[in-house]
Amino acid sequence: MGVWLKNGMSFNKDGELMRTHIKIEHGTIAAILYEQPLEANEDVIDVGGRLIVPGLIDLHVHLREPGGEAKETIETGTLAAAKGGFTTVAAMPNTNPAPDRKEQMEWLQARIRETARVNVLPYAAITIGQKGEELTDFAALKEAGAFAFTDDGVGVQSAGMMFEAMKQAAALDMAIVAHCEDDTLTNGGAVHDGEFARRYGLRGIPSVCEAVHIARDVLLAEAAGCHYHVCHISTKESVRVVRDAKRAGIRVTAEVTPHHLLLCDEDIPGLDANYKMNPPLRSREDRDALIEGLLDGTIDFIATDHAPHTAAEKAKGIEAAPFGIVGLETAFPLLYTHFVKTGVFTLKQLVDWLTIKPAQCFGLKAGRLAVGAPADIAVIDLETEEAIDPETFASKGKNTPFAGWVCQGWPVMTFVGGTLVWEKGRA
């Protein structure tokens, strides 16, 4: 016996939004009915005309465990994911210790099985301790369950080291995922090297420090035959480099964050460290280029770069506070309200950028509503308006620049493998 989600709205295979009933059985989608009456003896959940989408996928989150449990844990971070409609997240390796050896990856996998509320794909580090000095054992880490390889949080500074990493990853049919930043060009900055930095007398991070790493890496990826993925792209120059690389047939993909689509450095209200992230909020021209790049396919999908910190850390001020903001619980409402409701994106585009597009880029089975697919599903209320309130977050991190923003498009139910893991209003 299964359970039916009744009276929802979802996209069919032709991209048409239709009245939908979905049957969940044994952890998978057993049946889908479009524009038909439902006659069922099984249990029924009436979703009242709300949107039904594949569980959202976020391939860039920081769960902080081990070593950063004051900021977040696998349990709290994945509960935040479920609350945001995400059923699959990929956990970055800048933890203490990093998953840079087989034993640490095995420990992490066990911890995920014990405490995670949603599917977690663990990244492994490219270099030991993410120090950029010695490559990890890629084959052993893949065997232990690594999803892909990244030193996210820092850029791999040596071209030779990155090239060798790409060759090893290619031999294992694994991806290299890169935080792109040339340390010799960052200027010790806390914000973008633009008008905001000049106004407040702050050291700025120039755009070129990102683009130059991407330009280097796409050529290395071409030579190595490696799938190369660019994290949190933020500048118009970076978009241009990725666009040119794709035209040249290089296997490169890229993601963009909600905050880089929504904000630029002009929007920072004084020295508020909740607007400090890396890469920083760039210029209005950069933001416009990111939107254009997403629409024309240069940028493949959206990822949050969920980066929780404690209130005490963020209270240190914009120069001393750590980089990063949270994003799992607010991504869909923000993007729906400010891009779909305003006609910049279609609803289908937004859903695809948060589901099937990341799945296709990394060969995941998730990200689609189809018979036989995993029953990873989110139900979203497109009508109710609510203000973002960090005090209600499931995440330990409350560090968001979007407090008080009124949004529609709030998830109300999240299913992972057919199990209801979060429902609005239920403890």
UniProtKB/Swiss-Prot annotation:
Purpose of the protein: Catalyzes the reversible cyclization of carbamoyl aspartate to dihydroorotate.
GO cellular component labels: cytoplasm
Record: active site: 305
Protein name from the UniProt record: Dihydroorotase
PROSITE patterns assigned: DIHYDROOROTASE_1 (PS00482), DIHYDROOROTASE_2 (PS00483)
Family affiliation: Belongs to the metallo-dependent hydrolases superfamily. DHOase family. Class I DHOase subfamily.
SUPFAM superfamilies found in the cross-reference section: Composite domain of metallo-dependent hydrolases, Metallo-dependent hydrolases
Keywords (A to Z) from UniProt: Hydrolase, Metal-binding, Pyrimidine biosynthesis, Zinc
Binding site for substrate: 62-64, 94, 278, 309, 323-324
Disulfide bonds: none
Taxonomic source organism: Bacillus caldolyticus
Entry annotated with the keyword Hydrolase: yes
Gene that produces this protein: pyrC
Cofactors, names only: Zn(2+)
GO molecular function: allantoinase activity; dihydroorotase activity; zinc ion binding
InterPro entries hit by this protein: DHOase (IPR004722), DHOase/Allantoinase_Hydrolase (IPR050138), DHOase_bac (IPR024403), Dihydroorotase_CS (IPR002195), Metal-dep_hydrolase_composite (IPR011059), Metal_Hydrolase (IPR032466)
Cofactor note text: Binds 2 Zn(2+) ions per subunit.
Residues the record lists as binding Zn(2+) 2: 152, 179, 232
GO terms (BP aspect): 'de novo' UMP biosynthetic process; purine nucleobase catabolic process
The enzyme's E.C. designation: 3.5.2.3
Chemical reaction(s) catalysed: (S)-dihydroorotate + H2O = N-carbamoyl-L-aspartate + H(+)
Keyword Metal-binding found: yes
